């Protein structure tokens, strides 16, 4: 039997060495994780415009192929936040919640997280939603909110005012992460998922303590959960077993429950809470105008598969928020979240909150 040739070694590095791109890429392309501080150095080079497009592309792809660790992604996210415009939290605090996904599932569903965010806020839980325009679908959360009449270009102080006055604010990613433009251009040119796809849900400039976070890649959801655990957040990182970056109603979902610095992996079946199985085609969306129309219908009380999925994700966000309390119980938290989500829609509160939010942003 022929012995395969040895794998080429990365350049020898000492933890005290000043990083270089040859050192970083040498480790990644030979399947080795980076040493503490090396990922942060690379991301800082990217965010400050020092890294070349070739270096950025090589880093993003090789990190994804190697499979990033939670420690590496934590460094990426923290450097990105260091360069971000922060949402002031002196009036809104950090006990807010975000509902956001990585995108990239290829299903082109309606904007479930956007609708769920409005429902959660109408139920009395403060929301700071972080989002962007569509990258791979026909309509991202920002596109749909804009079609609903919302001003999406608000700065940090005005987003905080929205949360304080209305109960919900939208942080449009390009507005808060101007330094990310160097990576963003390369990411669009590459056209395939990279480690950068994980960063949107991890870099909300308001730093909410709770989140319902969707991940389109099951093998990377646990990595994201590890980042939230390091931060001491309460989060549900979810991956639909049909591939959606949402809590799905077509089958079961896998949930990584993050609470008090620990991560627990669970299988979640919405049928246990009375939800009928849907087909993914019943959740398919369209362009921004079509998705805005769907949002108006659901928030106006229309029943059906889209409402079910919105209720499920809204409840999940409230479960994550409840997890900020050490005595939160799993099943009772779900029962409470679902009841509050239904009441928020059926009472008209969600529809009214959307109208108030749109009006408030237009008057700023």
From Swiss-Prot:
Any GO BP: L-tryptophan biosynthetic process
Q: How is the cofactor bound?
A: Binds 2 magnesium ions per monomer.
Per UniProt, where does Mg(2+) 2 bind?
A: 245-246
Alphabetic keyword roster? Amino-acid biosynthesis, Aromatic amino acid biosynthesis, Glycosyltransferase, Magnesium, Metal-binding, Transferase, Tryptophan biosynthesis
Q: Which cofactor does it need?
A: Mg(2+)
Which residues are involved in binding anthranilate 2?
A: 187
Q: Coiled-coil region(s) at which residues?
A: none
Q: What does the entry list as the binding residues for 5-phospho-alpha-D-ribose 1-diphosphate?
A: 101, 104-105, 109, 111-114, 129-137, 141
The protein's enzyme class: transferase
Gene3D superfamilies tied to this protein: Nucleoside phosphorylase/phosphoribosyltransferase catalytic domain, Transferase, Pyrimidine Nucleoside Phosphorylase, Chain C
The record's listing under SUPFAM superfamilies reads:
Nucleoside phosphorylase/phosphoribosyltransferase catalytic domain, Nucleoside phosphorylase/phosphoribosyltransferase N-terminal domain
On subunit structure and binding partners, the annotation says: Homodimer.
Could you tell me what this protein does?
Answer: Catalyzes the transfer of the phosphoribosyl group of 5-phosphorylribose-1-pyrophosphate (PRPP) to anthranilate to yield N-(5'-phosphoribosyl)-anthranilate (PRA).
Q: Hey, which family's this protein in?
A: Belongs to the anthranilate phosphoribosyltransferase family.
Q: What is the protein's name according to its record?
A: Anthranilate phosphoribosyltransferase
Question: Which species is this UniProt entry from?
Answer: Mycolicibacterium gilvum (strain PYR-GCK) (Mycobacterium gilvum (strain PYR-GCK))
| Gene expressing this chain | trpD
